[in-house]
């Protein structure tokens, strides 16, 4: 037979309410952090062109090869399944994996030798790609091209999915010509 007196119940309720209040404060603090750090990228921004010394004028009577490539922040080997597409992954498998994928991406570009190349989901600094500056990596490899980077995504640290948060992301589009 278990005897519970009202002072024990009162003490237990205080502990449970304290735990609930602490959790509520943590959640409210995080929501406030995400909300206060949010800012929409401005429309019609003036972007800086990084000019190459080998720039040349376009000719109207010449064919040009154009390439577009969503590099998926260099995290997508064939067995990768992104969580927002119904998969399980939110980050690259490893920093080494991002570096390897960047080399593979650069190999594809060099194989095709486009006159113009447009890339999406290129991380400048992001948890999901282990803070590798992919814009700098691509720019160094294609130094004979002029380039323009336009940031279109800059998020606070996102604790989603819970098991492996996507983290903080600064990402955009880069064009080489």
Where are these regions (language model features)?
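N-terminal, active-site-proximal structural segment of metallo-dependent hydrolase catalytic domains
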Residues: 4, 8-141, 149-170
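A substrate-binding/cap region within the structured catalytic cores of diverse enzymes
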Residues: 170-172, 177
């Amino acid at each position: 037979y278990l005897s519970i007196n009202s002072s024990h119940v009162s003490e237990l309720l205080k502990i449970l309410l304290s735990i609930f209040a602490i959790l509520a404060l943590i959640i409210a603090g995080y929501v406030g952090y995400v909300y206060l750090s949010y800012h929409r990228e401005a429309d019609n921004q003036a972007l800086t062109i990084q000019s190459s010394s080998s720039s040349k004028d376009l000719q109207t009577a010449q064919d040009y090869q154009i390439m577009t490539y969503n590099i998926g922040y260099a995290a997508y080997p064939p067995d990768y399944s992104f969580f927002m597409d119904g998969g399980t992954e939110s980050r690259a498998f490893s920093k080494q994996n991002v570096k390897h994928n960047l080399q593979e991406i650069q190999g594809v570009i060099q194989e095709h030798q486009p006159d113009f190349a447009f890339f999406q989901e290129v991380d400048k600094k992001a948890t999901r790609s282990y803070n590798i500056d992919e814009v700098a990596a691509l720019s160094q490899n294609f130094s004979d091209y002029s380039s323009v980077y336009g940031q279109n995504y800059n998020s606070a640290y996102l604790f989603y999915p819970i098991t492996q948060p996507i983290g903080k992301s600064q990402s955009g589009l880069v064009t080489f010509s």
